[in-house]
């Protein structure tokens, strides 16, 4: 989980557009962000295992 101060800092408007970055909507993690889903890879994996993301299932070949 991200610190509350870091989440609050990210919500403020940045002075420059290049300083803006994405955070996971669930845990606030800034790295491993999946743009299509708006969450990080760890939260994506947990939700996919639970079957809460429609159209996503474990691959096997």
UniProtKB/Swiss-Prot annotation:
Subunit comment: Part of the 30S ribosomal subunit. Contacts proteins S3 and S10.
Protein name: Small ribosomal subunit protein uS14
GO molecular function: rRNA binding; structural constituent of ribosome; zinc ion binding
Record keyword Lyase present: no
Keywords, ordered alphabetically: Metal-binding, Ribonucleoprotein, Ribosomal protein, RNA-binding, rRNA-binding, Zinc
Cofactor(s) listed in the protein's UniProt record: Zn(2+)
Residues engaged in binding Zn(2+): 24, 27, 40, 43
Family assignment from sequence similarity: Belongs to the universal ribosomal protein uS14 family. Zinc-binding uS14 subfamily.
NAD recorded as keyword: no
An individual GO BP term: translation
NCBIfam families, per the entry: PRK08061.1 (NF005974)
Co-factor: note: Binds 1 zinc ion per subunit.
A single cellular component GO annotation: cytoplasm
Gene: rpsZ
One Pfam family in the UniProt entry: Ribosomal_S14
Annotated HAMAP family: Ribosomal_uS14_2_B (MF_01364_B)
InterPro entries named in the record: Ribosomal_uS14, Ribosomal_uS14_bact, Ribosomal_uS14_sf
């Amino acid at each position: 989980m991200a610190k509350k101060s870091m989440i609050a800092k990210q919500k403020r408007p940045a002075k420059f557009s290049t300083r803006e970055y994405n955070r996971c909507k669930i845990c606030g993690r800034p790295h491993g962000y999946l743009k299509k889903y708006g969450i990080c890879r760890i939260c994506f994996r947990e939700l996919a295992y639970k079957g809460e993301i429609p159209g996503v299932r474990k691959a096997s070949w």
